[in-house]
Amino acid sequence: MKKKSLPGPPRLAERLLKQFFPDEGIFTTIGDLEEVYQSIAEEKGSAKARFWYRSQVFKSIFSYYKNQLLWSTVMFKNYLVFTSRLIKRDKFHYFLNFLGLSTGIACCIITMLFLRNELTYDQHHTNADRIYRISSNYVTSGKPLLYANTSPALGPRLKEEYPEIEDFVRVLPLPELLFRQGDRRLYQERIVFADASILKVFTHPLLQGDVETCLENPNTIVLTETLARRYFGDENPMGKVIQVENQDDLTVTGVIKNPPRNSHVPIKGIISYSSWGMDQLALNVSMYEPSVYTYVLLPEQYNLATFYEKFPPFYEKYCKADEELYGQVYKLIFLNLKDIHYNTVGFRFEMPLGNRSYIYAFFFIGIFILVLACVNYVNMATARSSTRIREIGMKKVLGSSKKDLVFQLLGESLLVSFIALVFSYGAVLLSLKLLNRLLDFSFETGMLINPVLIAAVLGLFLLIGILSGIYPAFYLSAIRSATAISRGFSSSRTGVRIRRILVAFQFVISIGVVIITLFMNRQIEFMRNRDLGFKKENVVSIRLRDNDVIQKIPTFKQELIGNPDIISVATGIGQPGSPTTGLYKLEGRDGMEDYNFWVLWAGFDFIQTLGAEIVEGRDFDPSFSTDRQKGIIVNETLVRFMGWDNPVGKRITQGSHTDGHVIGVVKDFHFASLHNKIEPMLIRMISRPEDNLPGSVPGYLMVRLKSQSLTNTMGWLEDRWNKFNPNRPFVFSFLDESFDRLYDADRRQNRLVKIFSCICIIISLLGLLGLSSFTSLRRTKEVALRKVLGASATQIVLIMFREFFFLIFLAIVIAIPVSLVFIDMWLGKFAYRTGISPLLLIATAIGAILVAFLTASYHSLKVARTNPVENLRYE
């Protein structure tokens, strides 16, 4: 009878065995297991045989990998010991590697901190996806005029007409409030008026107080924990009273956690919107009078198209009448909370915005420095690895596989990267305060222990370790053992060529960044020293904050004018660097035409105090009673814009407030930064408070001093101020300093690029120093022979530097045009800019060659001074 054939072993288990078991055991192991399987199947059945087979496969695989893990652990320990010995033996090169990589990783960590801070603006609010800020767009003759704020009446009216709007919040930031605390008087910034719903719509966790009631009543305030501690120390602030100069006292009804700094509305205290009659002022305000920031909370997945479809009836009810009065069509713009920080360029009265170019610059800086550090490591590793050829050959002879060697060399790279990571983390921790001060950042120590950042940094460590070590690992492991043992020290043409390319690449970046830095410095100095059309030096600007002070200004001015060291005194609402805007009708060729122009509100002697020049007509004159309400001075740009041949007497109106005419033309001067061209501008007189007209309350008192006695006059001026206003701190600024602050962002960018250029130079010089050390070692015998044949140390140094001179020269040739492209892009944002200086480029090139020569000559000179007998003794 024919014997019944039995089924084979389980296919999946057999496939796993072939996949995971070592190659040399596949056939014997599979054959043995299959024989036993057949035997068990005959005696006990196929089911038990399959179970046995699967269990044996599992045990075999587990045993194999357990042995592999054990062996890997032993080898890993061996790698650590071996690498530590290498570091001790070659301290100099490893120190350069640690320094370069630590610098690169530290810069990357700082970049991550900055990007995380900037790209998560306002995302700490739970409802961020559903919160929208409404902005205003006033369209005149097809031209949009964008305002970040809206009428205080908009929020309540929208809530009434649109039931789908879940809630609204009005926020009104206050410039400063004078808080009284005992005998002290402190100007407090970042205080806002807001509706009680702010604590429900936005995420401001309450530490003390009731979210439902703490801002419901008038004259109540919620403080941040920092402000509460500032005013009340360790006492419980709840129920305490804060005195406000010339206003009702405020009662503390809540304390919130300090908001993150990456919020577009920085808050230190919230006053209930019903305080001081603010809510009553909003009842009948026109939609054409923007003053507050309005936020609405919309339902999830709400389609804004639905809102705009319903807007026409709302417009007819609340806006149509004012459209005819103002000659503007009113439109609403919805911006999601997370988009405000970067997407509202061009909005008037906008909060401080983020700068995307700053973010891109910082990102690419971090990438460039990291690439430089990795290139530096690869360069040094390949140069140093040439001295390890015999070691690699011996390991191959003793049985090490290519995989083992790759793992060993990658392990060395990862260990170096890990040590560099530890040092870089410490360096960042120690430098946070310095970075905050230099670059106006707001980094905190706690940001370094953020889980996301830690995960990113660990990923960065692995990436750097693998990328930096992979080329040296494969480069060395590919060498044949016989060749390696016979040659011992190797420097193939390919390896040398690659190292030269890497050094040249480093210097291209370094020289390019130095050129960019120098031109940025040149542009900033150009802006600081350019003739602005007025004299900004020696002008003290004193901020006038409340009505009590303003009432005393006429008497105070007379007191100041009596001082022989004071040239002139004037009041103004705006000053150069901070003008306002307004919509006016001007007499044109086709009748009265609508325009939105810049406006400076000024008192008598404003032009004289500023040091500007009247080129046609006259200045404001107290003897002309109509000047205060009807007199207007315009600049030359406005005259050209309007095409006026005889500007004096031209009519200018504004709504029902102004029916004026041009009395004079002032020579063009820069009333804004040099980023922008001089634009059309009007200068109007400050009205009397009782006239109830725009420009009724001056904002600044400007005093021009004689430069010879500046310090003494400032002391006298403070003494006079304290006499007239004993309850107000003497807070002032110099006009030239205020104007210089317009370029703070440019200076921060310049400081950033300076730091970047220093780091790039350091890393490049480290690479050059390491490579020159390797070159000197490689050419030791050549140098000895040259010395024997009569060459001097200077000749030897020059011969050895010749190898690097070509690289530096090539880097200069590439870096100059590339950097000029970036410079032209950066200068493009300035209406007035400096030119390209060939001398600056030549000086940079010469400086780069000299620095490279001094760096490379260190090792060359040391070898050149060595006794040739020492190097030729065994030849």
Where are these regions (language model features)?
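Transmembrane alpha-helical interface segments in multi-pass membrane proteins
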Residues: E391-L432, C760, K781-D824, A843, ...
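Mid-to-C-terminal secondary-structure elements
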Residues: D195-Q208, N219-S357, T555-A745
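Hydrophobic alpha-helical transmembrane segments of polytopic membrane proteins
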Residues: L453-P472, I511, L765, L840-K862
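Negatively charged linear elements and acidic catalytic determinants
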Residues: M1-K88, P868-R873
